């Protein structure tokens, strides 16, 4: 389940980042962020185990006080709603591209051009969003996230299949993009392997790229419900650590593979999202299936974002008690509100990505360091405490 908390469309956006970072430096950055993510998760595991708390906000109150808990609950609620809206909009966008690619609608005589305006029509938006939302509502009513373990296989399978499709088609798309964009005398059209200078432009691409990497690994609040499944098992702490190592290693490896494969497909002028690329004439059945699989992986990632939201709201208003009535009302209201906002304000993704990135760094990197420091029983001047705080604080500065 840990791996599925990370996967979404983000994994297919790294090619555009590589044009600024240089592929080599982006891969190095991806590996470093993966290592830091693993370390911050281990801080959460240690604090959770020592204090026998498997809820992020309750653990925060126990160690850092009620005011910090209120702050964390607010962050989790805002962050979760922002991510859920993004998932809604992305699922709808992918569904539209899937339908377009299958040519179900006769308005698409040209397979290469996706007419986004058609998908902004109310008579198409309304039934599709309602259908997606109802499906997500019934999934989110589940109380135990570990019952969705199978979704990890769907998420990993969707990513692996999509990367294989991109890899197999890489040669043809590379040749086509080189013919279109490469000019020998113009260095700006050359492949950027290791030039990090482009990232430090007025558009702050370096910080955008680093923030995207940190946000892609923001699974800290969603991982606590996963820990519940290990709590009463023999050697539960050891199993939690193994699951964390495996999950982060799997995610980081797939992220790095995605960077390399998607970048080499079109290193001259890549798409913002590699699976959105234009088909090279006629139907691309393999990529059409990939879009469907990625849509499913996003749908199954949705409950992993909703569960910590439900816990935070319950902790704030019902002392952590989640009755059946409360569960049903909150689930349907939350899902339909996110759906309504995502459908009406279709350009909201850009704003939500900034909100999510800003909140993520505090919630997932700074707070875990503080939890560990106060749990250790040693002063903040102790070398381990100082090193953990400095490391996580540097992550906050970079990701901001």
Place the predicted regions along the sequence by residue:
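Loop-to-helix transition at the N-terminal end of transmembrane alpha-helices
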Residues: 21-35, 156, 242, 355-359
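Short, hydrophobic transmembrane alpha-helix segments
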Residues: 13-23, 145-146
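Membrane-interface "cap" regions at the ends of multi-pass membrane proteins
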Residues: 1-16, 38-42
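Hydrophobic, membrane-inserted alpha-helices
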Residues: 10, 132-137, 334-339
